[in-house]
UniProtKB/Swiss-Prot annotation:
GO terms for molecular function: diaminopimelate epimerase activity. Its EC number is 5.1.1.7. It catalyses: (2S,6S)-2,6-diaminopimelate = meso-2,6-diaminopimelate. It comes from the Bacteria. Homodimer. This is Diaminopimelate epimerase. Keywords: Amino-acid biosynthesis, Cytoplasm, Isomerase, Lysine biosynthesis. HAMAP family: DAP_epimerase. Its main location: cytoplasm. It is found in: Cytoplasm. Substrate binds at N13, Q46, N66, G76, N77, N159, N192, E210, R211, G220, T221.
Length: 276
C-alpha cells in the first residue's frame, strides 16, 4: 500500500496528514506506531486522516491518531493544519469548512499566509464530560499525587484536560508530574496535563503533557482549556495570547455557552509518498 502524505506542523506540534478522500487508507495501530517513529518512519506527534463526511451539510471527517497508535477525539493545532491541507490539496475551494470529529463538529477556516482560525466549539466543564471522578462540579479540584496535592481546573475541548497554575513554567516538573496526572485513577480515560503560568490578564505561558504523546512543543486544545479555566477563575480576560515552546497562538472566549476561537499558524514542511 502506497500512501501520499504531507508533513505539517502547528507551532512545532507535528503531523503526518493523509488524504483519505482520494486514496484508500486502512492503518493498524502497529503501522501508525511505525510511521510515527522518528528513526524508522516519518515521525510525528499525531497522524491526521481526512475522510469524507458522514452527514450531509458537513465537508469532511477529521480523525486523529497519537504516535502510540491510539485514536483520540480532538487536536487543535491539527485542525489548523487540516484547514490548510484540504485547501492546498484541492479537496475544497472553501476557506471555512465544517468538520466532523469524534466529539462533534468544528469549523476551521484557512485565512491564508499560513494562518488559520478554528471555532473549537463550546467547552464543557462537568466532571462526567471528561470523565473525571469527583463528587460535584467546582472551579478547581484538589488532586492527590505522589509529590503532594495539586489544584487543577478541568475542561473538555472534545478531549479531556487538567490545568494547574505554576509560578514558572520553565521550572515546572512536566516530565515527572505530567505522567502522574495523565494516568491518575481519577481520569478513567486518562487526561492531557497542562502547566500554566499567568503573565498578565491577556497573556500566559503553557506547557502540556499530552495523553498518549508526552510533552509536545504546543497543544492547541490545551491552550483553549488553559484559557477557559483561567477565565472561569477570574484570572484572565476574554482574549489571551498563549506562549508555547513552539510559538504563539491567540485564544478568545466570551464565556459560558460560547465557542472557543483559536487563531494560529499552519505550516507544510514537505510532501511525500511511503509504501507500507
Amino acid at each position: 500500500m502506497k500512501l501520499k502524505f504531507s508533513k505539517m506542523h502547528g507551532l512545532g506540534n507535528d503531523f503526518m496528514v493523509i488524504d483519505g478522500v482520494r486514496q484508500t487508507v486502512s492503518l493498524t495501530p502497529e503501522q501508525i506506531r511505525l510511521l510515527g517513529n522518528r528513526q524508522l518512519g516519518i515521525g510525528f506527534d499525531q497522524l491526521l486522516l481526512v475522510e469524507p463526511a458522514r452527514e450531509a451539510g458537513h465537508d469532511f471527517r477529521y480523525r486523529i491518531f497519537n504516535n502510540d497508535g491510539g485514536e483520540v477525539e480532538q487536536c487543535g493545532n491539527g485542525a489548523r493544519c487540516f484547514a490548510k491541507f484540504v485547501r492546498d490539496q484541492g479537496l475544497t475551494g472553501k476557506s471555512r469548512i465544517e468538520v466532523e470529529t469524534a466529539r462533534g463538529v468544528i469549523a476551521p477556516e484557512y485565512l491564508g499566509d499560513g494562518l488559520a482560525r478554528v471555532d473549537m466549539g463550546v467547552p464543557r466543564f462537568r466532571p462526567a464530560d471528561l470523565p473525571f471522578l469527583a463528587d460535584a462540579e467546582a472551579l478547581t479540584y484538589s488532586l492527590p499525587l505522589p509529590e503532594g496535592r495539586c489544584e487543577i481546573g478541568i475542561a473538555s475541548m472534545g478531549n479531556p484536560h487538567a490545568v494547574q497554575r505554576v509560578d514558572d513554567v520553565d521550572a515546572a516538573p512536566v516530565a515527572e508530574v505530567g505522567p502522574a496526572i495523565e494516568s491518575h485513577p481519577a481520569f478513567p480515560q486518562r487526561v492531557n496535563a497542562g502547566f500554566m503560568q499567568i503573565v498578565n490578564r491577556g497573556e500566559i505561558r503553557l506547557r502540556v503533557y499530552e495523553r498518549g504523546a508526552g510533552e509536545t512543543l504546543a497543544c492547541g486544545t490545551g491552550a483553549c482549556a488553559a484559557v477557559v479555566c483561567g477565565i472561569r477563575q477570574g484570572l484572565l480576560d476574554a482574549r489571551v495570547t498563549v506562549h508555547a515552546r513552539g510559538g504563539d497562538i491567540v485564544i478568545e472566549w466570551a464565556g459560558e455557552g460560547s465557542p472557543v476561537i483559536m487563531t494560529g499558524p499552519a505550516v507544510t514542511v514537505f510532501q511525500g509518498e511511503i509504501e507500507l
